[in-house]
């Protein structure tokens, strides 16, 4: 099992001194990944349902905070203040940025870090942010995400790539240097829904669900294993070996205070260190290869 630590992009720790301390301490302690989330703007009025809370409310909206650091900038800064730890976008809202810009930026970072970049990808959930940024239609975000990822893979792996999609078109372009990692930086597909799982099978190297989505609960080992079985079934249907897909898990609700699950038992990853270590072991036994906290 590999472990990643989320870096703050907002709040009292979102400053150079504290992020530096957290990042370098995580590297010393043996963490495998530093992760950075993605918002470019935070509208002051949000009616879109946030997928990772029971009531659909976006927690950043409490108190009217709109603070957030930009993902690619912070990722680049982290690359410069660490030596060996891998870096993960967790996740990039893929429609937020031009795919060729993302491909070039991440390939450059992979070169400069000698292969430490991991590209976490999501389709996004906040309609208001899409509208503020002037992006392709929010309702087409799944198609846009799939096409952008495919285009990025093309420029990472082909000498003079051509792409003719609905949202991306280019012809025999040059995009060098290529990433250090062969064939490209690992692509982690975030999301718990069936479209996200299909995206993983078609385009991803790692499936990266968040355990706190109430529509697709994975806050017990049983529900997590059921979704993994569904993913493996989709892989079989597509002719892809399930073992070729890594399994990651974002654990957003860990705490040393034991909490009660809705079924009356203990919520996983809460409680004593021994209890949480046993939870981790059980997830590892189920095939999980990476956990982000």
Model-derived features with residue positions:
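Active-site-adjacent structural elements that line small-molecule/cofactor binding pockets in enzymes
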Residues: 1-293
């Amino acid at each position: 099992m590999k472990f990643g630590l989320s870096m703050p992009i907002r709040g009292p720790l979102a400053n150079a001194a504290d992020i530096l301390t957290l990042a370098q301490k995580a590297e010393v302690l043996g963490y495998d990944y530093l992760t950075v989330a993605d918002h470019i703007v935070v509208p002051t009025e949000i009616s879109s349902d946030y997928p990772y809370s029971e009531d659909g409310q976006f927690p950043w909206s409490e108190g009217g905070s709109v603070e957030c650091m930009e993902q690619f900038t912070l990722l680049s800064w982290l690359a410069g203040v660490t030596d060996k730890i891998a870096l993960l976008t967790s996740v990039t809202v893929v429609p937020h940025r031009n795919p060729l810009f993302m491909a070039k930026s991440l390939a450059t970072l992979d070169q400069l870090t000698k292969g430490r970049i991991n590209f976490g990808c999501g389709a996004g959930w906040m309609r208001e942010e899409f509208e503020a940024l002037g992006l392709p239609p929010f309702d087409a975000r799944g198609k846009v995400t799939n096409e952008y990822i495919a285009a990025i893979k093309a420029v990472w792996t082909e000498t003079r790539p051509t792409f003719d999609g609905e949202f991306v078109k280019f012809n025999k372009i040059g995009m060098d240097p290529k990433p250090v990692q062969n064939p490209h930086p690992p692509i982690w597909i975030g999301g718990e829904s069936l479209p996200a799982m299909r995206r993983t099978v078609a385009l991803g190297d790692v499936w990266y669900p968040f355990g706190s989505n109430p529509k697709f609960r994975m806050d017990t080992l049983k529900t997590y294993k059921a979704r993994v079985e569904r993913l493996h079934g989709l892989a079989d249907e597509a002719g892809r070996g399930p073992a070729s897909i890594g399994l990651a898990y974002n654990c957003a609700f860990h705490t040393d205070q034991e909490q009660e699950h809705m079924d009356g038992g203990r919520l996983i990853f809460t409680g004593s260190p021994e209890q949480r270590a046993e939870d981790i072991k059980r997830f590892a036994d189920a095939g999980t290869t990476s956990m982000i906290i």
